[in-house]
Structure formats: structure tokens, C-alpha cells
A protein has these predicted regions:
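Active-site-adjacent "subsite" loops/lids of carbohydrate-active enzymes
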Residues: 48, 56, 60-76, 147, ...
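The substrate-binding groove and active-site-proximal loops of carbohydrate-active enzymes
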Residues: 61-72, 112-128, 180-194, 239-250, ...
């Protein structure tokens, strides 16, 4: 995800941009930030809600712990992750199965991920079908499992020659562009978009996943120039400016996925996790009272349109800021997304920054290890919030601040997990 899915230097910089932080504003508090007091009924409703956790595989953030593990070691780590999800009273795991133009399962369209074996294109030990093992393990425990892909990212550095020969970027070099040190599939090329859609159809055809999911990487940023020729070829005749054309490319992709995956599996959940700010009020009349990086303008993702037109089943905005932050207030953004989802059938799950709880954080609000619990209280009193998804799985290991504080909250408010009659369980 733009703020957090990679902890590389470049993406940490993007975190700062996305949050819109400056040294002076990072701790700025909005004294007028609206607060809510949940009722007993609110807490009871929250106790039985959908709760998910992202399991990041890019750069081995969460799984596997390192490359080159044996099949038995991969299974043991998967079991530990799934057992922990049950313990935390989660109801779903979002497993990243395509971090970079690759796959955590045998695919006809993408090579095996190098984050498993150490070399892209090389199968895991004993040809273990990693996704299938996770699907079976999740369902055995009553957990939903959602297959999470990054649709367009090809590399985070390195050379194309280092990729497997059957990587789409190697097979179709005309489908890609390089921005900085990273390569991306070009969303403006219809065949490239179609290939990504086919990849998701392959997953729902071959695996009993409960959902398919993408995060917030669409176009890499606003000030790119690498697709000007693509615009001349595919967009200029119909669009007066490249910005609207880019948004249309992303809109088409989202609608195509919605149509094609539901042809195969009508009940599968198609979800998107965008950056937490759609647009600022100062830039768009329908935007939020914020001053941060905007997915509508910077990533060309018109998520509000997808919600209103119901071309997605669930939205999980990454509201990765604290309550009271002047430029991007958690409470203001939660209310904004609630209002957008009101009157639609789109589920609204809040993406919560569990990873930011840190007694040594440079931001005062996140040094207070109760910040996520305060956000949970606010969400309990927000009737249009349907649940949460937490980033990221490693933050719920033994001794981690998010684990300890959330277990306390879950116990206090009698959270129902997959073994306690939560309606989101697959049991």
C-alpha cells in the first residue's frame, strides 16, 4: 500500500508525502476534532464485525520470513500466521499473492515469486502450492482468505534481465514503463490491463478464495511523463487531457475485474484499498477537509466513483493517521468515507495503521499505545463502518504494542472471533 506496503527507502519517502507530514504539522492537533461516545449496542455491533489483517509478502515483510525455506518451514510459518489471526479475533487474512508481477501459486500467466525460493520463476520446495495451503488452512480455522495482488508493479529496482523469462514484462516489453528505478505495467495499454484481469480470474477459477483484493498502486505518481506516447496512441482522440484519460484507464480496469471475476464466482468479494484521502476539499468540491496526498489526482484512482457505481464490493481506505491530526484527521476521514458509502451496498472497512504504534515514534500521538484503541472506539460509534483491516501481520507477534493493546480491547468489549459465532466466519 502506498503508505506502508514496502519499507524500502523510496517508499518510506512516499509515506511522508502521502501523509503530508512536515516536522511542525506531524503533531498538530485539531481541538475541534469530532468525538463520539459509543453505546453498549455500538460495542456489541462492533464485536461481531469483519476484521482482517494484511499479510505482506513483498520483501518478506510478513511471510515467508526469508527466502529458500523448505515446504515444511513454509507450512509452519503459514500455520503460525493463521493461528495468530484466530487469537486476535480476526475473521479474514489478506495474503499478498502477487507482490511484483509474480505469483505465490502455480500460474500460467505469472512466474513463481522470488520472495519464496530466492529466484523468480523457481518453484518452492516440493512444488508447494502456497496459496492452496493458505486457503485450506484459513478455512479449516473458520477464517476468510482474500488473495491480494499488486496489479501493475513489476520491480522495485534491479534490471529486467533479472526477472524470469515468463514474466509479463519480459514477454511484452512494450507493456511497461520505467519510472525512477521501478518498472510498471502501463495501465494505458488495453492488453496490459486485460492481462492483470485474467490473472485475477485465474485465481478465482482455481482457488476457493473468499475475495480478491488490490491495494493503492495504480499510476506511480502524478508527475510522470513515461506514458505520453501511450496517451497519443490510445487517449488523445477521446480525452482533452491526460489526467482524465489515466483515471478512465483505472476505472475500466476496476469495472472489468468486477465483471469478470463475478462471472466465475458471483459471491467472491472484490475489494480495493486506496490511499486514505480521495481528494482534499481545496482541490475538489466533493473532497474531505484534509491537506494530504490525493489518490484522485496523484494515483488517478477515482474511488468515490467506484463506490457510487458499485463496481467494487468493499473499500478499505488506508486511514493511517491519528485522531486530531490537523492535515489528515482520522475521525474526519472516517466520517467522509462513511458518507460516501452511505446509500450503497459497498462494505466500508477502515484500513488501520497498527504498525505505527511505537513507544519510540517521532509522532507523539503514536507513542501513546492506545491510539488504535481510540480509533476503534470512534469506529464503534460510526454506524456506516462495517469493520477494519490492520496493517500488517508482523505487528501482532508476541510483544508487539498493537498485539497487547488490541487484545485488551477485544477482551474488554467481548469481540467475537471465528470460534465465537462471528457471522463473518466461514464455519
Amino acid at each position: 500500500m502506498t503508505q506502508t506496503k514496502l519499507f524500502s527507502t523510496g517508499l518510506l519517502l512516499l509515506v511522508a508525502i502521502l501523509a503530508g507530514f512536515t516536522a511542525s504539522s506531524a503533531n498538530a492537533q485539531d481541538a475541534s476534532a469530532p468525538l463520539k461516545t459509543p453505546t453498549a449496542a455500538d460495542y456489541e455491533r462492533q464485536a461481531a464485525q469483519f476484521r482482517g489483517v494484511w499479510v505482506s509478502t513483498v520483501s518478506n515483510i510478513d511471510f515467508p520470513s526469508k527466502r529458500g525455506l523448505t515446504a515444511d518451514e513454509l507450512k509452519a510459518e503459514a500455520d503460525a500466521q493463521l493461528d495468530r489471526a484466530v487469537e486476535m479475533k480476526f475473521t479474514a487474512v489478506f495474503l499478498q499473492v502477487r507482490p511484483m508481477g509474480d505469483a505465490f501459486y502455480p500460474s500460467k500467466l505469472y512466474p513463481w515469486s522470488g520472495f519464496i525460493s530466492g529466484k523468480q520463476g523457481q518453484a518452492p520446495d516440493q512444488n508447494l502450492d502456497v496459496l492452496q495451503y493458505w486457503v485450506e488452512g484459513a478455512h479449516k480455522r473458520g477464517l476468510q482468505i482474500h488473495a491480494w495482488i499488486n496489479p501493475y508493479r513489476v520491480t522495485i529496482g534491479g534490471k529486467l534481465e533479472d526477472l524470469a523469462e515468463n514474466n509479463p514484462a519480459r514477454l511484452h516489453p512494450d507493456w511497461i514503463f520505467k519510472h525512477g528505478e521501478r518498472y510498471f505495467l502501463n495501465p494505458g495499454i488495453p492488453e496490459a490491463r486485460e492481462h492483470v484481469v485474467k490473472g485475477l480470474v485465474e485465481i478465482v477459477t482455481n482457488y476457493d478464495v473468499d475475495g480478491v483484493h488490490i491495494d493503492d498502486y495504480f499510476y506511480p505518481e502524478r508527475n510522470i511523463t513515461e506514458d505520453l506516447e501511450t496517451y497519443e496512441k490510445y487517449g488523445k482522440a477521446d480525452f482533452d487531457n491526460i489526467e482524465d484519460w489515466r483515471r478512465d484507464n483505472v476505472n475500466k480496469f476496476v469495472a472489468d475485474v468486477n465483471r469478470e471475476v463475478h462471472k466465475v464466482r458471483p459471491n467472491v468479494v472484490w475489494s480495493v484499498s486506496p490511499a486514505g484521502i480521495w481528494a482534499n476539499k481545496g482541490s475538489h468540491p466533493d473532497g474531505s477537509e484534509t491537506r494530504g496526498n490525493q489518490c484522485y489526482f496523484n494515483l488517478y484512482a477515482d474511488v468515490r466513483k467506484w463506490i457510487k457505481e458499485e463496481t467494487i464490493d468493499a473499500v478499505i481506505p488506508q486511514i493511517y493517521w491519528h485522531i486530531g491530526l490537523e492535515i489528515a484527521n482520522f475521525s474526519i476521514l472516517t466520517d467522509w468515507w462513511s458518507d460516501v458509502c452511505e446509500g450503497t451496498d459497498v462494505k466500508f472497512y477502515v484500513g488501520v495503521a497498527a504498525y505505527r504504534l511505537d513507544p519510540n515514534s517521532k509522532t507523539e500521538a503514536w507513542r501513546d499505545l492506545q491510539e488504535v484503541n481510540r480509533q476503534l472506539v470512534y469506529m464503534a460509534a460510526s454506524p456506516r463502518v462495517d469493520g477494519q483491516v490492520f496493517f500488517t501481520a508482523k505487528n501482532f507477534k508476541e510483544g508487539q504494542p498493537a498485539r497487547n493493546t488490541m487484545l485488551e480491547y477485544a477482551k474488554e468489549h467481548n469481540w467475537k472471533g471465528v470460534n465465537d459465532g462471528n457471522p463473518n466466519s466461514v464455519k
